[in-house]
Amino acid sequence: MDYRSLLEKTAKENNSISCMGIDPNFSSLPEGVGVDAYYVTLLEEIKNKGIGIASFKPNIGYFSRLDKPLDGDFSGSKALASIIKALPSSPFILDSKRGDIATSSANYAFEAFGCWKADAVTVSPYMGHDSISPFAVGYEEKGVYILNRTSNPGGKDLQNKAMEDGKPLYMVVAETIAKWNEEYSGGIGAVVGATNLKEFEDLALFYSKKEIPLLIPGVGSQGGSAEEVISIMKRVGYPLHLARINSSSALTHPWAKKKEKAPENWKDICISAIEKFAKECAL
């Protein structure tokens, strides 16, 4: 099954376009609960309650930092493996933001799709087409989300720079993503943040007729609103089933923003937040 079909299928099955980010805040974990046990507990409860989360996005960096390879310690990789094995049957997006010369990208592509068995991966476009093609050629059934207009405050430093024709760089990148989508496979998508709704609307409108998958961070702790994002996509005619709206710490560590310790009823609080988010992202 190609990636766009997988997105459509799982959006309909879950009646949602939600994506749960897995970005552990280690200082906010309950005392005595390991990172793998923490997330596996939440994932099992999601499955038991039938909560419709339509994709999952673990960030590999949070787990790589736990490894100490020179000491023979791969506890971070093992924790991530345990979490991946516990995921429900929705698309698994490996958030690794790779992108390098072709030979290096080929190895990063195998890392994502061969080693971790991801359905999709995030990559940077900065090094051009030969850094992207290894993720697409030979992996036509996979998804490749290319950073377009990111949700972080520093995204504007380069992405909003005006080109000679007056277009912002992020729009030139969008045009390039659309070209690569046609050239390589329909699984080429874009990462477009929800923290600037005017820019989001411009990009959603551009992508609406091209059926390019969107991964939308910036909702929850970063301030974006799932309801506003969905309203915009409906208004511009973007096919909702190809979108995934991501929220991470607001679902899995709601107390972290206030720098509070994990409460005793952490599981119930998280599941309530996850359930609410899934409904906010309903089709």
Language model feature labels by segment:
Residues 1-89, 265-283:
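Conserved N-terminal beta1-alpha1 strand-loop-helix module at the mouth
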Residues 14-18, 51-54, 88-91, 117-119, ...:
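Short, well-ordered coil/turn segments that N-cap beta-strands
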Residues 20, 56, 95, 121, ...:
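Conserved, mostly hydrophobic/aromatic
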Residues 229-238, 242, 251-283:
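C-terminal helical cap(s) of enzyme catalytic domains, especially alpha/beta-barrels
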